[in-house]
């Protein structure tokens, strides 16, 4: 595989269609149901670049020689580039969400922010709001973690 997506279950993904239509290269979906399979896949390093989806955005970080500061802050890598056998980990959600905020004039400086939910984009949203100077950030969740200050 040269380019593709790894994750536990990929039936929901439109990544193959999007990448092949817009970029003109083959993009493979590679379901890896177990962490053991992910570790073996990363050890082989037989890819040029991959995207990573749940539940492996944290475990892949162990295999990266370099991790982008945004990915470190979010504690999740969703893109890995193989450069001569060294794996470089990035999180494209952070710049993507930042771009959307800029495009729509969303300001965070000295504001109070409410984030609804603790799903996949929570940490990204929180990090962008924090980095852009939010005064306070609250999270409301159906499954709160009181240690993180989350509420129902």
Give the label of every model feature segment:
Residues 2-104:
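Phosphate/diphosphate ligand-binding glycine-rich loop within oxidoreductases
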């Amino acid at each position: 595989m040269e380019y593709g997506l790894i994750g536990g279950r990929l039936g929901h993904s439109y990544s193959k269609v999007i990448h092949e239509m817009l970029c003109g290269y083959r993009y493979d979906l590679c379901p890896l149901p177990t962490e053991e399979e992910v570790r073996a896949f990363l050890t082989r390093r037989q890819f040029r670049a991959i995207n990573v989806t749940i539940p492996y955005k944290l475990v892949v970080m162990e295999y990266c020689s370099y991790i982008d500061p945004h990915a470190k802050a979010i504690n999740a890598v969703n893109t890995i580039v193989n450069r001569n056998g060294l794996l470089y980990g990035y999180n494209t959600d952070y710049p993507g969400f930042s771009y959307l905020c800029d495009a729509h004039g969303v300001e965070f400086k000295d504001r109070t922010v409410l984030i609804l939910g603790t799903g996949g984009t929570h940490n990204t949203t929180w990090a962008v709001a924090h980095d852009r100077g939010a005064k306070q950030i609250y999270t409301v969740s159906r499954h709160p973690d009181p240690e993180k200050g989350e509420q129902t």
